Amino acid sequence: MDYNRVTKRLLVMGVMALTILGLGVIAQATTIPSPRDVVLDTSQRVLEALKNQQITVADDPEYFYGLADELIVPHFNFRRMSQRVLGKYWRQATDEQQVDFVNQFRQLLVRTYVTALYKYSAKDITNFLQERIKVLPTNYPPEATRVNVKVLVEGQNGGPPINMILNLYLNKEKTWKVDDIQVEGVSLVTNYRATFYREIRAGGIQGLIDKLVSRNQHAMTMK
């Protein structure tokens, strides 16, 4: 499966998605936390989990996978993202294939995120969170059900900042969920869609799922 071009950009998206989902809690007396609060809240818990850790991702990747599953994954709607990624092919998939694809796609993204952080320590990640990320104010009408939270990532060595957008929607449970990430206008969903469509045309939906299973199993053996 040709992930090379997609993965280079998605590694950046992955790192940002892991680190941006939190930076401190902003408490508001509202029934439903704002999208910005959701973005700001989560990694306060990530910071708490990391602050006393001396390990790198390479030392104990399973710890970081578990951290992502516990604190990051719940804020994404992977089924909705999967529907958007597969587009017209989603309805062609059987119920079992849909479930399998969602699970494998989620696993692919989480492992891509963690792998992108492989050489960094918990302290490195914490410093990055605290020093280089700025979640911009978000204005939206009270009735809004879709909101884009803009994030500015300070450039390295005086370079230009990276503009990032988290696309959130309000679900039926009145909870804000992420269903796409954009970095400098490049969408995670759109990027993967182009790659997956090529795989489906070559080997069908099941062929794509089988390749994702193989890729994820291989990633699990990489320490």
Language-model segment annotations:
Residues M13-G22:
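Bacterial N-terminal signal peptides
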Residues L23-A29:
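Sec/Tat signal peptide C-region and signal peptidase I cleavage site
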Residues T31-L117:
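Early exported N-terminus immediately downstream of N-terminal targeting peptides
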Residues N103-F105, R111-I165, R215-K223:
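Surface-exposed, charged secondary-structure patches
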Residues D2-G14:
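Bacterial N-terminal signal peptides that target proteins for export
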Residues G185-K223:
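Non-transmembrane domains of secretory- and envelope-associated proteins
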Residues P161-T190:
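Short beta-strand edge/turn micro-motifs at domain boundaries
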Residues D37, N52-I55, D59, Q92-E96, ...:
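Surface-exposed, polar/charged faces of alpha-helical domains
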